[in-house]
Amino acid sequence: MRTAALLAVPALMLAGCSKADRDAAGGEGEGVPVGATAEEYQAALGDMEPVELTYQVSASSAESSSGQREEAFADAVEEMSGGAITLDIVYGNAVVPPDEISSALADGRLDLAHWLTSYHADEMKAFTNLQDALVSVETSPLQGEIVSHFTAQEVAFNTPEIMEEFDAHGMTVLNPYNTFGSTALACTSEKGSPADFDGDQIRANAAAQSQQIDALGGSTVTLQLAETYEGLQRNVLQCTFGSPTSMVMSGWLETAGNVYMPKDSSFVSGPGSIVAGSSWDGLPLAAQQLIYDQIVAYNTGELGNAFVSAIAAAQASTESGGSGMHFLDSESEEALKAGNQRILDAVAESENLDGQQLLTDVEESAAKWADIAEELGYTDEGDYLDFADWYAGNGDVMDPEYVGPIVDRFY
């Protein structure tokens, strides 16, 4: 039964010799056992010529909060392999623009990449259904972030139609769904009811966000990420969707310091995926396994980045003279929930997969991860505006002592 398989993820997905077994079948040479040490990996890679893999990411620099997770991933790969595998991180999509990443992975200009999956809704229709299905997950600074993070990855890996879409692009998936944190709405003025959104031009970065904008009473604008800062400054835009990471990194909060999150549901996210291209099949099996195994470091940094960025966004939004980071008012929340229900109804009727099963999978996975988070002590003690006061982590992006227990449960 598919639901039973879902609840066992990623154990079933990664069963066998290593977490890499699912997609590493094409690799040559001997693999390593589960829990292999650095010494075992290095022995297995002893006959491999050192290799440098070009890894393009959207983070602006190594020093940025999102860049720190990339550096941690690369460092873990190099250390575990004894220098046999290194990742050359290219920041800011400097090799190719986002719409050329797929072809660059295919022709070898890139080996690994952060692919902006949400930009390809026409090609990734089942994936887009998952984006939309996740609006049913409740939002909160700590537990909600954890639940949405692992629910998205778990369901993506367990939905054959989604994995087939990556396969059709010649991609091997390392991390199917990452968002830089839950999606928020940053506005140039305070919003206390749906009437305050009336006539606002709101930038969307995912297809179904237009339905959420309609529900709130605004009008949808499509604008490139790089143009959003100026759009807010010139009042072409009154609000924009985005992750707290993007808001801080792009300076949007200087002008749009009134940030809103839903509570009983979610805004549609604009995620990306960590994928490998055509060169993957040329790596020895042990090398593939090693890279897969070190995605744990990436996930640790992804969660840490989400927490740190939420704190930074709350602080930056008040420092800019805005009202800070809040949950939507109750009337706007109800309007959004009505819009989200229309999104969920469309998922249920999807022609791309069994939409009703997808909704069930998301519901069950979210409940599972909420229970696990509760069990491990990840509970919300306040809201976004005072998150810095009650967050129990050390405030660093890479905080394995705090984030490690929940990441380890996934793997």
Feature roles, as predicted:
Residues 31-41, 106, 117-201, 205-216, ...:
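Contiguous mixed-secondary-structure segments that line small-molecule binding/active-site clefts
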Residues 26-71, 92-96, 246-247:
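Extracytoplasmic "Venus flytrap"
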Residues 12-16:
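C-terminal motif of bacterial Sec signal peptides marking the signal peptidase cleavage site
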Residues 1-5:
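Bacterial N-terminal signal peptides that target proteins for export
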Residues 219-326:
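Pocket-lining segment of extracytoplasmic ligand-binding domains
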Residues 67, 90-133, 184-188, 240-256:
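Pocket-flanking alpha-helical
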Residues 17-21:
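Bacterial signal peptide processing site
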Residues 47, 51-85, 167-238, 244, ...:
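Bilobed "Venus flytrap"/periplasmic-binding protein-like clamshell domains
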